[in-house]
Amino acid sequence: MTTLSPEAFAGHTPMMQQYLRIKADHPDTLVFYRMGDFYELFFEDAEKAARLLDLTLTQRGASAGTPIKMAGVPHHAVEQYLAKLVKMGESVAICEQIGDPATSKGPVERKVVRVVTPGTLTDAALLSDKNDVYLLAMCTGHNKRGVAVNIGLAWLNLASGALRLAEIEPDQLAAALERIRPAEILTPDGATDAIPAGAGASKRVPAWHFDIASGTQRLCDQLDVASLDGFGAHSLTSACGAAGALLLYAAATQGQQLRHVRSLKVENETEYIGLDPATRRNLELTETLRGTESPTLYSLLDTCCTTMGSRLLRHWLHHPPRASVAAQSRQQAIGALLDAPANASLDALRSALRQIADVERITGRLALLSARPRDLSSLRDTFAALPALRERIGAIVANADALARVDAALAPPAECLDLLTSAIAPEPAAMVRDGGVIARGYDAELDELRDISENCGQFLIDLEARERARTGIANLRVEYNKVHGFYIEVTRGQTDKVPDDYRRRQTLKNAERYITPELKTFEDKALSAQERALARERALYDSVLQALLPFIPECQRVASALAELDLLAAFAERARALDWVAPTFTDEIGIEIEQGRHPVVEAQVEQFIANDCRFGTERKLLLITGPNMGGKSTFMRQTALIALMAYVGSYVPAKSACFGPIDRIFTRIGAADDLAGGRSTFMVEMTEAAAILNDATPQSLVLMDEIGRGTSTFDGLALAWAIARHLLAHNACYTLFATHYFELTQLPAEFPQAANVHLSAVEHGHGIVFLHAVNEGPANQSYGLQVAQLAGVPAPVIRAARKHLAYLEQQSASQHTPQLDLFSAPPAAVDDLECADAPALPDTPHPALEKLRDIDPDDLKPREALDLLYELRTLVRSHDADGHA
């Protein structure tokens, strides 16, 4: 706790002194200070909140001679304001009144009960149902010379309790953060590690929090183990330092221990198929290139019935396992679900899953003692539904090991269910303060207090009847209001009949209101009973939460099984609805896809042309040529997506598919300027290409699209040619290489492992029809002018382009315009790659033939046809005069 000098409080009121002490402990955090029905912010916090939340900034009095600037939000709407602030990367300390105003002699006692930060969200109102929120800490490991040798990462999903560790090379940080996507990143004070822009809100914490020995011990204490050997984390010293800082920070924000963080997963990069940031972006796994959530592979696959399944799907897509065993187990389960008997049909199973609550997040809130009444009723109803759910899958578990494992994990925790059933009302109120949360019959004292409150009406009816009979006042009434409580009302004309034990409580224009000793006694009992019932209910609810804590591991087990079952059922539904098949796997090098389809594009169009893709030891690179908009990029992406889906465990959009080992997927598709990093489009392209050339292995799948753009034609051609040869000669990876440099189609003559394929188009009238079919051999042209015409480029521009194209093609073979080279001339005989003959340029097409290709005879008038004939003769004579055959 921060200690302030007495001078800091001089002249401040006691309440402001209390606030300043609290604020001193949270200097970089907005403090929501509870005052009655509002959370107030003061001074700089008020100014900042008013700006961020569009609140009214007020000024009320002064403290120590300084005007008190204030802004506030109503307590019942605080969650919507918290959601806005954490989305902006802000943290908020919630300061509640914990003392009783009636007994406080000075300011009501207050303390910070929790700190809401971007990475520590657990409230349902602050969380996205289908996205996990991660808090990540990073700790750099150095050698004896002070050189960074690794970066230890620890990240926690506080809502579920999932904790993971990893150690990576320093240059892998951007890829790791892109995969994890933390909402908040903790780094040591003074650290120089550069966090990529947009990676998450950054928070500096004291460097001693990252002490490796302390972190290791804190991690052991958290997991209740003597050693981390059983988790495979004993050698991850940097990651243990990061974990120590992470656990310390997370516990401090919650103001309590993290009871649900009881296990640890160590992630190794060799465990999953590598996907760098460019690949995740270009394949549009969970986000489109435009930044929208659909249409993506995730949006297509996500037909999950629970939010737990949806979140697990996102995790699986970003973590495809390299070992095919996991994928085969999942696909076996999908097959069993598709072949299930009528009493365990897929539709019936999914219908049952729709009734399941978010057990994972409810368990997290339960562990933090922040679960609300309807969380507990939802947990109860879910556990009650588990036996029927297990009956549905019981008939098919013998056909799938994954389903058998899920079935065993779905055994409901009986004691937990009994407690929830007996303690929680069938339909509880949203908040404990509203009452009606604890079930009748659970506590005798509460039942008695409720009876007093609930039987109030009958007592008043009986009292009114007795008093009318006793006094003879026929219109006497017994009533209640919040200001005066219970009273007996008598009209003016009947007051002479009032008995002596009536005491006047209020005089009205036409009536008098009285209280009697009997009514006063009842009033005291009834009003106190309601307050006592609410207090008793609060105490009972807290005791129920405490009693449920031992069941957290069982709740987590059930949540994990439900998420996996839901996702497997969603995969089965997609396979059935979209006509997908189970892929097969082999240990041999190769990829065989028969009639593959792009899963996302197919869902957006009426008809999709399926295509084959084949790789093997004798076929490692496909040179893809064809027209713009012909489908080259779609074909490339669909190959990568089908491979990824297969290893994730889904069925795939193809007639058949077989995959050998795949360790990484690389893409170099499209690019844009990196303005923030000061890199041009070409520089971005070359950086991505360099990563592929340096890291791709014979088991990597590489997508290269239009490499060499953004510089001069010959520089680009030379680079594309050299990169393609390097991928063949050195990387020997599976490569899809799309290009408009037709000169590269000669590469298979030098490298038999390369093959030409093309996508065709045919001209029809003035237009062009794309066939989208992949055929063997190179394309004959790219139809760039026709595509420009389709895009709406004005006709005069198209005609001018055609003429200039003919001129350029005529000149290109006879002369070469000097250009500024990216490279100096290479020295003689460096190696076989640099000394290899460059591809020869093809013969220039005859200009007369080019002219004829652009003619539609049906559109020519007789005079135009004659003029065209003379023009063609002139082109032929001119061409011959220049020495062409």
Swiss-Prot record:
Binding residues annotated for ATP, in chain numbering: G626, P627, N628, M629, G630, G631, K632, S633
The protein's name in its UniProt record: DNA mismatch repair protein MutS
Function according to Swiss-Prot or TrEMBL: This protein is involved in the repair of mismatches in DNA. It is possible that it carries out the mismatch recognition step. This protein has a weak ATPase activity.
UniProt keywords, alphabetically: ATP-binding, DNA damage, DNA repair, DNA-binding, Nucleotide-binding
GO terms, biological process: mismatch repair
GO cellular component terms attached to this protein's record: cytosol
One Pfam family hit: MutS_IV
Family assignment from sequence similarity: Belongs to the DNA mismatch repair MutS family.
GO molecular function: ATP binding; ATP-dependent DNA damage sensor activity; damaged DNA binding; mismatched DNA binding
PROSITE patterns: DNA_MISMATCH_REPAIR_2
Organism encoding this protein: Burkholderia cenocepacia (strain HI2424)
InterPro entries referenced in this protein's UniProt entry, alphabetically: DNA_mismatch_repair_MutS, DNA_mismatch_repair_MutS-lik_N, DNA_mismatch_repair_MutS/MSH, DNA_mismatch_repair_MutS_C, DNA_mismatch_repair_MutS_clamp, DNA_mismatch_repair_MutS_core, DNA_mismatch_repair_MutS_N, DNA_mismatch_repair_MutS_sf
